């Protein structure tokens, strides 16, 4: 039994708490799970209004493309009677590879493509110039591993559909992405003359995988059985968020409400939350599996990924051999784009733009 006893002081826990605050301030972000952006009601209403306009316009265009009138859109693109490719850049930083893309676009006719940029408004970026000038669409905040990336892609699709009825393919491009071929090579690949002559339906180039070791955890990231009845586990798919969709599939994406109600829900398990890699493959696999190739045209290297990010290429790795290697695939087609490149790769890439990248 102690000889002396001291009364408990209320100052001790108070002092302990005060001393702990600086520690929590500095270590908290590394201990607590990061907060994910959610879809706000105003943003949802803005998107629905945009989608409805694009859907109404698409459904009113039942005539063959050759009967479409020549029009000038609010983004300044002039419609002609040849199908176009809509290049949709999704970025939260400067477009570091704009000079390389400028060469890509300047080597072809301007009436064969349109450019759209979704730039996170919370981040200040340099105003794009050249063919990219005035191409930023009304944008919202985005965050990796959140439904905001799905919203941004849908926003780009709807804007491009509304802007020009001759946008026939819609390619989603990252700011870390580079072209691997010339524009004319890509255009010839997508609008194959044999398909045109036979009046065949075009296919969407989107990766759709049904097997993955992490698929179950990602399916239940919002809670067990939350995805049902809209999406059962055997319908859940995964794939690259960067795709090249046909117009009919772009329409299906912006028409969807059923699956979106589930994919926009916040995740409980944020470590397994990558909705942007599941929404599009799952939706199109359920809606039109035969209309999709199930592979992407964007090459990415996952051999030494870090925190869910693919391998990043740096200047010492950039060479003609790398470009040739990145083009190769396991199928009969060639990859058209590649990521992820660090901004300082621009100079070595520009040095071999004409002699390697755009020499088909």
Role assignments for model-derived ranges:
Residues 1-360:
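ER/Golgi luminal nucleotide-sugar-dependent glycosyltransferases, focusing on the catalytic module
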